[in-house]
Structures are given as structure tokens and as C-alpha cells.
């Protein structure tokens, strides 16, 4: 469906303004769809992102600093998210005896199981781009990379 219909706006200042609004709108649309899937597993989008980072580092621990650097949403509070995951038993942490500021974080078996269940639902994530051909998906990826570049 066209953006103009979705947000009931007939005109934009120009095409660059329209793409900005379109990207923000599309982010919200995808986030809503993905949040529903994550909610089924008792986690948020940000918690999912952190779990994926932890799994990528596994079996080695990682630090809050590295998590923060790799997060998709740079404005998220990585320490708070890790604490929520710890409370749910999806992540664990180890505070250094020598330096109390150094905290190692790692994913638990329960956290891995949640990600495995979400991996099985990967097709649901991919269905959101099913209206695009593979060539269009590749082109969109290139254009988005170029825009940020």
C-alpha cells in the first residue's frame, strides 16, 4: 500500500522528505510485527538483539561495552537490558573479583532455547519482504547501505 494512503498525507515537501517519512513508517510497521513474535517468547526487540549478540560470542563471554557497540538501537540501555535478561534466566553475568567494573556477560541454555525457537520462526520475518524479488531485496540492501554510508 502506498505511504500516502497509510498515513493520510497527500503531499510531501519533496522525494527526499518522503523517503525519510517512509523509512520511519516502515521501521514502525516492521517493529510492530516483530514485537508480536518476540512477545510470544516473553522478550522485547532490544532483548532479542542482545541475545543474538551473546549467541554470536558464545561460548565466550562478552562485555556491556561490546554489546552496546553492536546493538541495532544505539540509544538502548544495554546494562538494563542485560539485567532484564538475567532476571529471566536468559543471560548470566560474572563480576571480576579484581575489577568490580568489569562484568562478563554470557547467554544461558535457556537463552539459547529461546533463540532456537525464534530461529524456527525466521520465515515469518522473511515474509515481510516476500513481495519483493530477490533482485529487489539486494537492490534495497545496497541502497540502504549507501544511504548510511
Predicted regions and their residues:
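C-terminal regulatory/oligomerization modules of transcriptional regulators
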Residues: 1-12, 135-149
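N-terminal leader segment of winged-helix/HTH proteins
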Residues: 1-41
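Pre-recognition alpha-helix immediately N-terminal to the DNA-recognition helix
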Residues: 22, 49-53, 113, 139
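Short, locally clustered residues in the helix-turn-helix/winged-helix DNA-binding domain
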Residues: 24, 52-59, 119, 145
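N-terminal helix-turn-helix DNA-binding core of bacterial DNA-binding proteins
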Residues: 28, 32-74
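Short, hydrophobic-biased segments on the C-terminal half of alpha helices
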Residues: 64, 82-83
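Charged, amphipathic alpha-helical coiled-coil/dimerization segments
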Residues: 83-139
Amino acid at each position: 500500500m502506498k505511504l500516502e494512503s497509510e498515513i493520510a498525507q497527500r503531499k510531501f515537501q519533496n522525494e527526499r522528505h518522503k523517503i525519510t517519512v517512509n523509512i520511519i513508517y516502515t521501521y514502525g510497521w516492521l517493529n510492530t510485527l516483530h514485537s508480536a513474535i518476540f512477545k510470544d517468547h516473553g522478550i522485547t526487540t532490544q532483548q532479542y538483539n542482545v541475545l543474538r549478540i551473546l549467541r554470536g560470542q558464545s561460548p565466550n563471554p562478552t562485555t556491556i561495552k561490546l554489546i552496546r557497540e553492536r546493538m541495532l538501537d544505539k540509544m538502548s540501555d544495554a546494562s538494563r537490558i542485560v539485567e532484564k535478561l538475567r532476571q529471566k534466566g536468559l543471560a548470566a553475568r560474572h563480576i571480576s573479583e579484581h575489577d568490580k567494573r568489569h562484568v562478563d556477560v554470557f547467554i544461558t541454555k535457556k537463552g539459547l532455547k529461546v533463540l532456537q525457537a525464534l530461529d524456527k520462526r525466521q520465515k515469518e520475518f522473511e515474509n515481510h519482504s516476500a513481495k519483493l524479488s530477490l533482485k529487489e531485496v539486494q537492490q534495497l540492501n545496497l541502497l540502504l547501505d549507501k544511504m548510511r554510508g
